[in-house]
UniProtKB/Swiss-Prot annotation:
Quaternary structure and partners: Component of the biogenesis of lysosome-related organelles complex-1 (BLOC-1).
Domain of life, per lineage: Eukaryota
Protein name, UniProt field: Biogenesis of lysosome-related organelles complex 1 subunit SNN1
Similarity section: Belongs to the SNAPIN family.
One of the record's GO cellular component terms: endosome
Source organism per UniProt: Eremothecium gossypii (strain ATCC 10895 / CBS 109.51 / FGSC 9923 / NRRL Y-1056)
Keyword Transcription applies: no
Length: 98
């Protein structure tokens, strides 16, 4: 607006300056808020990816824990099988001697 239009509209030049300064600041604030929302959305997406990765790793660790239990059980069964094999060999030897 040129000075004659401002005067005819009944707007004081200082009011126009204040409005201009406040408007540009408000637009900057609005833009900053928009950028913050976008970065917040990206951070939430990254957080969800990290959370999913963490949960997957936790599941793997729990599976490894259950595998350790199963391996211990297999080892116990192997020991029992070895003892039974020895007993069978001894019985076969005794039966062969008869």
């Amino acid at each position: 607006m040129n000075p004659s239009e401002v005067a005819s509209a009944g707007i004081h030049p200082i009011e126009l300056c204040v409005h201009s300064i406040l408007s540009s600041n408000l637009e900057g604030i609005y833009q900053a808020i928009t950028e913050l929302r976008e970065s917040q959305a990206l951070l939430v997406m990254k957080f969800n990816q990290v959370k999913k990765s963490f949960m997957d790793e936790q599941e793997l660790l729990q599976e490894e824990g259950s595998l350790k239990e199963e391996l211990a059980r297999v080892n116990q069964l192997k020991k029992r099988l070895d003892k039974l094999t020895e007993l069978y060999a001894e019985l076969a030897r005794k039966c062969g001697a008869l």
